[in-house]
Swiss-Prot record:
GO terms for molecular function: serine-type endopeptidase inhibitor activity. Keywords: Disulfide bond, Protease inhibitor, Serine protease inhibitor. The keyword Disulfide bond applies. InterPro entries: Kunitz_inhibitor_STI-like_sf (IPR011065). Belongs to the protease inhibitor I3 (leguminous Kunitz-type inhibitor) family. Heterodimer of an alpha and a beta chain linked by a disulfide bond. This is Trypsin inhibitor DE5 beta chain. The keyword Disulfide bond applies. Inhibition of trypsin. It comes from the Eukaryota. It comes from Adenanthera pavonina.
Length: 38
């Protein structure tokens, strides 16, 4: 495994995404929690 640029971005809906930049920008959403009740 090579070292890759990793970044975590949080959008307005409080969804956390792991952004992996490997050639083409690739965004993997690993948290999608609807928190309407909170």
């Amino acid at each position: 495994l090579e070292c890759k640029d990793l970044g975590i971005s949080i959008d307005d809906d409080n969804n956390r995404r792991l952004a992996v930049k490997e050639g083409d920008p690739l965004v993997v959403q690993f948290v999608n929690a609807d928190r309407e009740g909170n």
